[in-house]
């Protein structure tokens, strides 16, 4: 059974474009959104809709980190997950007033749905739930700064891997080749339905997204000024790299609550006392810039975002 057609804004969260902060903002403003005829629908117990992304990954695909983290590798597990998410969304939609639009957001829409077939599965699932028309919003960040910020996040999470030396690495291309990303999504949802936005928007990502939504009028609720994921100075990153290498068990993902707590305390202290930014070595930065920066500026021009 489907619900009456209702508009949906699908936020395809690209890497290091404030998705976590945006999701927290939308979740905090549910009452305000309801008064505007909209609702933010995260997964139960989450801030985002990664469960919906996991539903749409090809059944034979076991490569995806999201599937491994959620324990969804066997075909019967995947099919059961799809049914569970469908029922959860149906219940959430049934609780909304008729005609209210919904906002769905996840970084995994971008990271995990890497083929037109997977994006098509998402489109079909939304249609089966009575969601439409669909407006897709994708924020795009300058690729070199994106990768430098990503490396800082990787180190803070306990990761020991360096940034790929080759900017043509498939993972780097996935998150830095913005033209290819837009082409995948527009090939499924249509060019007019997919809107690119430059990150960071001058008024804040929350206000920028709200301004794109039909029927939503300002003034908008204020956004938090504090950054939830600030960068670190080079010496602070070097300290964390040393800890990751010498004490690989001392990570934010440790099964021990005491270890996780101590790492959070250290991270908080560094965020307040050593906030800054990481820069790649000059030669590596030049290779990344030569491959992606010019194409990014051209894309901004084509999209009218320069």
Q: What are the functions of these language-model segments?
A:
Residues 2-306:
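Anion-recognition interface
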């Amino acid at each position: 059974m489907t619900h009456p057609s209702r508009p949906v804004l699908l936020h395809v969260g690209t890497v290091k474009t404030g998705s976590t902060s945006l999701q927290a903002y939308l979740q905090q403003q549910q009452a305000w959104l309801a008064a505007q005829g909209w609702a933010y629908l995260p997964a139960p117990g989450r801030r985002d809709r990664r469960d919906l992304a996991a539903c749409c990954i090809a059944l034979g695909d076991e490569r995806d980190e999201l599937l491994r983290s959620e324990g969804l590798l066997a075909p019967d597990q995947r099919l059961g997950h799809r049914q569970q998410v469908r029922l959860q969304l149906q219940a959430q939609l049934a609780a909304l007033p008729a005609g209210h639009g919904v906002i769905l957001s996840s970084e995994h829409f971008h990271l995990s749905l890497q083929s037109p077939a997977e994006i098509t599965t998402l489109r079909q699932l939304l249609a089966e739930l009575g969601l439409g028309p669909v407006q897709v919003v994708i924020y795009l960040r300058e690729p070199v700064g994106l990768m430098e910020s990503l490396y800082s996040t990787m180190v803070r999470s306990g990761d020991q891997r360096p940034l790929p030396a080759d900017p043509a690495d498939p993972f780097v291309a996935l998150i830095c080749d913005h033209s290819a990303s837009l082409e995948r999504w527009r090939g499924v949802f249509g060019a007019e339905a997919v809107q690119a936005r430059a990150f960071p928007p001058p008024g804040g990502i929350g206000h920028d997204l709200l301004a794109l939504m039909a029927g939503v009028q300002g003034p908008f609720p204020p956004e938090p000024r504090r950054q939830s994921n600030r960068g670190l100075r080079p010496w602070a990153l070097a300290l964390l790299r040393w800890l990751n290498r010498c004490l690989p068990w001392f990570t934010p993902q440790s099964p021990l609550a005491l270890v996780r707590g101590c790492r959070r305390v250290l991270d908080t202290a560094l965020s307040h006392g050593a906030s800054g930014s990481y820069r790649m070595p000059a030669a590596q930065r030049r290779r990344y810039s030569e491959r992606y920066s010019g194409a990014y500026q051209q894309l901004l021009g084509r999209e009218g975002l320069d």
